[in-house]
Amino acid sequence: MIGLIGRKVGMTRVFTEDGVSIPVTVVEVEANRVSQVKTLETDGYAAIQVTTGSKKANRVTKPEAGHFAKAGVEAGRGLWEFRLENGEEFAVGSELTVELFNEVKKVDVTGTSKGKGFQGAVKRWNFRTQDMTHGNSLSHRAPGSIGQCQTPGRVFKGKKMAGHMGAERVTTQNLEIVRVDAERNLLLIKGAVPGATGGNVIVKPAVKA
């Protein structure tokens, strides 16, 4: 399913004709340039590889420079892939723009969530706190029991505990497209999308729409 790579600009709001305020996230989608077309015969699957934005010449590695030169496209800030469905065809060097979403109502947005560092179980997993009084000493935000006794004699894998929070790939599904601004290469998406301002996001037509 083909999507677009964009950059999260921030949030604002737009008004409907009857004065209702809609909170929207602005995603800037510069032209996505096709840098490679993968086929079933040569790669074992059908997909296109795209790049967007720009990268300083001294930041482009030699293998990357050769790859972009072969495709005849300007070096971008990264490389992403979209699987192709039967009948979809693209040429190397062609460009994908926000107009791809002119007829799309709902999208899934994938980004990297904001990193929160090392956090306790209350913030990370929404555990309830223990009693503030009634004899409790120094265990107000402690997680409590983490298992049983001699049987099984271990802590089960996946046990919710304190640890590194955020900075992981997150997808928010079924977000509504409020406006497609082809002139300024902007997508206005209702609600919040994952990640910090300036982060890369992948916008695809919703799978559950």
Swiss-Prot record:
Methylated by PrmB. Gene3D superfamilies: 3.30.160.810, Translation factors (2.40.30.10). InterPro entries: Ribosomal_uL3, Ribosomal_uL3_bac/org-type, Ribosomal_uL3_CS, Transl_B-barrel_sf. GO terms for cellular component: cytosolic large ribosomal subunit. The modification N5-methylglutamine is found at Q150. GO terms for molecular function: rRNA binding; structural constituent of ribosome. One of the primary rRNA binding proteins, it binds directly near the 3'-end of the 23S rRNA, where it nucleates assembly of the 50S subunit. Part of the 50S ribosomal subunit. Forms a cluster with proteins L14 and L19. This is Large ribosomal subunit protein uL3. The lineage of its organism: Bacteria, Pseudomonadati, Pseudomonadota, Gammaproteobacteria, Vibrionales.
